[in-house]
């Protein structure tokens, strides 16, 4: 993923589905997943390029085909039917070239299955934390 100036990056769109697909993960779950994946220290679980999309999401660049495979993979990992806040971009989609990279933009895009269990778990914990925080606030008001 070649780096460019911020002004040029705002105008440049990256075509998904050929060299990579993109998995959009809510932030901070994406940052937490990235730290865990790097912390494993295992080449098979090494993330590829990861970018920040504003303050709301992390973009994990993965091998093409992830968009098509995501629903079945989530089902296989027992996360099917749970709204984790994930979105995949693939063939026919374009995204603005990221301005902020959290992990090596030149790294090869891994297969999504290598990362998905960790990402899904982090998203689930994010949802549980939000629910816990809401319940705690409601209890303190009541």
Outline where the language-model segments fall.
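Signature for HUH/AEP ssDNA processing cores
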Residues: 1-55, 64-68, 79, 102-142
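A contiguous pocket-lining binding segment that forms or flanks enzyme active sites
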Residues: 59-97
């Amino acid at each position: 993923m070649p780096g460019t100036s911020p002004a040029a990056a705002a105008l440049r769109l990256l075509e998904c589905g050929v060299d990579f697909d993109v998995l959009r993960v809510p932030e901070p779950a994406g940052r937490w997943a990235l730290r865990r994946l790097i912390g494993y220290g295992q080449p098979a679980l090494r993330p590829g390029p990861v970018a920040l999309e504003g303050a709301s999401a992390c973009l994990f660049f993965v091998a093409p085909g992830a968009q098509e495979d995501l629903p079945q993979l989530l089902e296989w990992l027992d996360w099917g039917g749970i709204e984790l806040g994930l979105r995949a971009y693939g063939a026919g989609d374009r995204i603005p070239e990221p301005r902020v990279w959290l992990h090596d933009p030149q790294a090869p895009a891994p297969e999504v299955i290598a990362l998905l269990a960790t990402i899904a778990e982090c998203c689930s914990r994010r949802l549980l934390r939000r629910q816990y925080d809401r319940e705690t606030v409601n209890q303190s008001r009541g």
